[in-house]
């Protein structure tokens, strides 16, 4: 019997142990890096058992991969795209309290959601021992494998649910403690000989991490009533009052408009056709004449969905940060939160710190990796004012980092640390958020408070994850396939890149190998690369598409990988569309 089976390396282990037959495989949850090895060890007689509520994520994965809601406008994390590429047949399903026997071992199923909505643990009682196979609830004493799997919304979508499943995780871990296990055996992680200490340490760390997150969270502005138990805490930053906006600005939806003295308009973002209607009304009223420029703050769908129609309606020059442009010009190449299929025509990709004149205003663009890594900031100087348009990165309550998939990095001059230092240097008279009607600003003391908070988090999260830098546990997309999705034709050769971000302070070796469908009868040789510290590099593969490939199919190409000797399994995937 096996419990979980993450990758093909299990076959080597079985051979060393002279095990030739696998009778049963029990799975704690459906994630591919926990399951994909099953195709290398199972035969027709192997009985596969899974959590009852996750059966569809084993037996019917094709529905997941073909459903557009799991590809575009991604606001939910459950189920996660760490899904098998191809369905497997399930023999049995299990729910809380089910018992089974294997030899003289009694196995009891415990429903332990947290890492996924329906993950289970298995209590093994044999020879007087009580051992729990706990899936990915815990990695080691005080540690978890990653943070982003706990993204879960208490209200609305999962997008706003940073560490949102920490309560269910705590309940599940308390349940395990109540079973008085002698050992915990995680799927990713080390065998834990003191479960009580390991669990208590983990939950104390998670609670402290959440408190530090909330202390400067922009979400407190949008939903102040949701956090009453954190009100008036001395170590939480007070929420600042708003400021009146200058008379030459207009705000509709997520769009800010600057109107010059000659009545020309400079528009930022267009997430809804209603914005186009509002601009047409301003033209009818004579408040503005023509739209001459469009600035795109970031790639999220509520900021770009209507840009193609906007560009058809108004003949204007479109600018955006060069890193933002990578996404909005080729959205099919990415699978990241709030991604829109809308393709934006960008006339000019701005460099960090690049300036230009627009009527009486001086515009200066910055790469501004705040709410998301793919984000720009714009300083507008004129009429004796310094206005900073921060996209969605700030509110008067603090920073917008409540979706772990947005790539909010920790570190000096990185992520929000970089953004806050830039604002401190520029000292704008007004700061603007695309979702907030009024302006605001930060005091020097508030900026220092937020910078200190981020430094504290870096130390806290380093303890929480089994990595040498916390960004590996926080940045879900530190490894990605590029393009994520591409159209392929029979008989052609296509390129697939696997990109790795080395968050460490020393070089790291990355190794990977795409896993092609067995019917293709093609094996791609694994490749490795040394990645320099604090850089992103890529491994390129050229893949031959079979001449007899079926048309109108979405083919999932998982990529097996390791990082500096640590096996990650089929950690990422790409999509080929025929």
Predicted regions and their residues:
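Terminal connector regions
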Residues: 548-578
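Active-site HxH/HxHxD metal-binding segment of metal-dependent hydrolases
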Residues: 7-101, 274-277, 282-356
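Short proline/glycine- and polar residue-rich coil/turn motifs
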Residues: 529-537
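Short, acidic/polar linear motifs in exposed loop/turn regions
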Residues: 272, 502-507, 547-549, 565
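Short, solvent-exposed loop/linker segments at beta-strand-coil boundaries, enriched for Pro/Gly
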Residues: 516-522
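Accessory terminal helices/loops
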Residues: 147-256, 262, 417-511, 523, ...
């Amino acid at each position: 019997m096996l419990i979980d089976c993450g990758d093909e390396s299990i076959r080597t282990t079985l051979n060393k142990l002279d095990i030739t037959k696998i009778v049963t495989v029990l799975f704690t949850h459906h994630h591919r890096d926990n399951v994909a090895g099953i195709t290398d060890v199972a035969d027709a007689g192997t009985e596969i058992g899974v959590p009852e509520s996750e059966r569809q994520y084993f037996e019917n994965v094709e529905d997941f991969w073909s459903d557009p809601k799991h590809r575009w406008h991604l606001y939910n994390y459950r189920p996660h795209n760490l899904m098998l590429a191809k369905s497997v047949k399930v023999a049995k399903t299990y729910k809380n309290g089910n018992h089974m026997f294997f030899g003289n071992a009694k196995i009891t199923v415990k429903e332990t959601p947290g890492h996924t909505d329906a993950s289970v643990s298995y209590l093994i009682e044999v020879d007087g021992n009580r051992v729990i196979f706990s899936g990915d609830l815990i990695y080691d004493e005080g540690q978890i494998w990653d943070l982003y799997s706990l993204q879960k919304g208490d209200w609305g979508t999962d997008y706003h649910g940073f560490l949102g499943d920490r309560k269910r995780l705590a309940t599940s871990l308390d349940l395990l403690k109540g079973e008085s296990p002698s050992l915990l055996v995680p799927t990713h992680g080390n065998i834990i000989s003191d479960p009580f200490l390991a669990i208590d340490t983990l939950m104390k760390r998670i609670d402290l991490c959440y408190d530090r997150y909330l202390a400067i969270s922009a979400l407190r502005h949008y939903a102040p009533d949701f956090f009453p138990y954190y009100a008036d805490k001395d170590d939480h930053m007070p929420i600042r009052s708003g400021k009146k906006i200058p008379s030459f600005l207009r705000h509709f939806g997520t769009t800010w408009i600057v109107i010059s003295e000659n009545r020309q308009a400079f528009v930022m973002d267009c997430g809804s056709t209603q914005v186009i209607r509002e601009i047409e009304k301003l033209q009818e009223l004579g408040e503005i004449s023509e739209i001459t420029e469009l600035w795109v703050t970031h790639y999220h769908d509520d900021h770009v969905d209507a840009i193609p129609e906007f560009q058809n309606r108004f003949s204007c020059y479109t600018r955006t940060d060069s890193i933002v442009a990578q996404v909005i010009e080729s959205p099919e190449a990415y699978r990241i939160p709030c991604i829109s299929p809308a393709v934006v025509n960008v006339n000019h990709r701005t460099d960090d710190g690049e300036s230009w004149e627009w009527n009486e205003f001086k515009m200066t663009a910055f790469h501004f990796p705040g709410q998301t890594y793919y984000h720009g900031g714009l300083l507008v100087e004129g009429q004796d004012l310094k206005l900073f348009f921060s996209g969605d990165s700030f509110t008067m309550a603090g920073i917008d980092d409540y979706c772990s998939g947005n790539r909010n990095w920790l570190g000096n001059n990185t992520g929000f640390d970089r953004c806050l230092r830039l604002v401190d240097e520029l000292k704008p008279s007004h700061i603007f958020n695309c979702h907030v009607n009024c302006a605001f600003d930060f005091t020097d003391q508030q900026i220092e408070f937020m910078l200190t908070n981020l430094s504290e988090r870096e130390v806290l999260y380093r303890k929480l994850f089994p990595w040498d830098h916390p960004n590996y546990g926080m940045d879900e997309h530190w490894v990605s396939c590029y393009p994520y999705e591409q159209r392929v034709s029979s008989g052609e050769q296509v390129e697939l890149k696997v990109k790795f971000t080395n968050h460490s302070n020393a070089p790291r070796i990355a190794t990977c190998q795409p896993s092609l469908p067995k019917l293709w009868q093609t094996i791609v040789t694994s490749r490795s690369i040394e990645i320099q510290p604090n850089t992103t590099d890529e491994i390129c593969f050229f893949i031959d598409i079979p001449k007899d490939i079926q048309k109108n199919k979405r083919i999932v190409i998982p990529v097996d990988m390791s990082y500096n000797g640590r096996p990650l399994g089929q950690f990422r995937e790409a999509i080929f569309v025929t």
